[in-house]
Design a protein with these regions (language model features):
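Conserved class I S-adenosyl-L-methionine
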Residues: 1-43
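Class I SAM-dependent methyltransferase SAM/SAH-binding core
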Residues: 40, 48-93
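A short acidic, Gly/Pro-enriched loop at the edge of an enzyme's catalytic core
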Residues: 95-102
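Residues lining the SAM
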Residues: 106-108
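A short glycine-rich, Lys/Arg-flanked "PGG" loop and its adjoining helix->strand segment in the class I
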Residues: 120-132
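SAM-dependent methyltransferase
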Residues: 137-210
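C-terminal lobe and adjacent flexible extensions of AdoMet/dcAdoMet transferase-like proteins
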Residues: 204-244
Length: 244
């Protein structure tokens, strides 16, 4: 899963300021006086957040469903001499060796879980391995973003090494099918690869129901990269939740 995406992911995400986002997330842990010492990075992808938290002195467990994503993550950790445990697991079947005192899930990774039962299970599994009174911070794309921003629109991302055509098809039920065509330059030839997946936005009621069943209390909901309340045109929200 996400095999082709893994090797182009970082190029396509060049506009993401990972350090700024890491500092923002860490500040939320500190705001609630819950700075982690051993943290779960769920759906860690290529390890950008995992390594940046490790550079802050946090011990990190990175979990992702893609072997290829984790391969890239391990290379980064080796280069930075970070000792991070990476596990290839489905979020809905998360199984750690013990508990953690903090958890994150970033960049709409939970939206990739399109089955509501699996969505609830993923949150419940995080809660199971989270110590009492500690925080799980995650973000989600909103219904507005899926219906009005992604919708049936097509985007083009053009870098020196990769040309990507990003096509969206709105499926209803707040779900968008995303089809990516990559054209990667090798020598003087462009190689074409593709990746397809769906993302689903969940209603506030669905999210709160999943949190309640998992024994997590919502401490705050912010517009991403801020401490402002979300509005009707907010594209991504951040949930700060605490295990009861």
């Amino acid at each position: 899963m996400y095999s082709e995406f893994a090797y182009s992911y970082d190029i396509l995400m060049q506009n993401v300021d990972y350090q700024k986002r890491t500092d923002y997330l860490y500040s939320l842990f500190e705001k609630f006086d819950r700075a982690p010492t051993l943290m779960l990075d769920l759906a860690c992808g290529t390890g950008e957040f995992s390594n940046r938290f490790a550079n802050k002195g946090v011990s990190v467990i990175g979990v992702d469903i893609s072997y290829d994503m984790l391969s890239v993550a391990r290379e980064k950790s080796a280069e930075q001499q970070n000792d991070i445990l990476y596990l290839c697991q489905d979020a809905a079947e998360l199984d750690l060796y013990g508990t953690v005192d903090g958890a994150i899930c970033c960049l709409d990774s939970l939206n990739h879980i399109t089955d509501y039962g699996d969505f609830c299970n993923a949150i419940a599994r995080v809660s199971l391995f989270l110590e009492k009174d500690r925080l799980f911070i995650f973000d989600l794309n909103t219904e507005y973003k899926h219906s009005c921003v992604l919708g049936n629109n097509t985007f083009v991302i053009d870098t020196n090494d990769v040309y990507c055509v990003w096509q969206n098809e709105y499926q209803g039920n707040n779900t968008v099918e995303i089809n990516l065509d990559f054209f990667t330059r090798e020598d003087n030839v462009y190689l074409r690869t593709g990746e397809s997946f769906c993302e689903r936005a969940y209603t506030s009621a669905e999210i709160e129901n999943a949190l309640n069943k998992a024994g997590l209390k919502t401490e705050a909901i912010y517009e991403e990269m801020s401490q402002n309340e979300p509005c009707d045109t907010t594209q991504r929200v951040v949930y700060v939740t605490r295990k009861m």
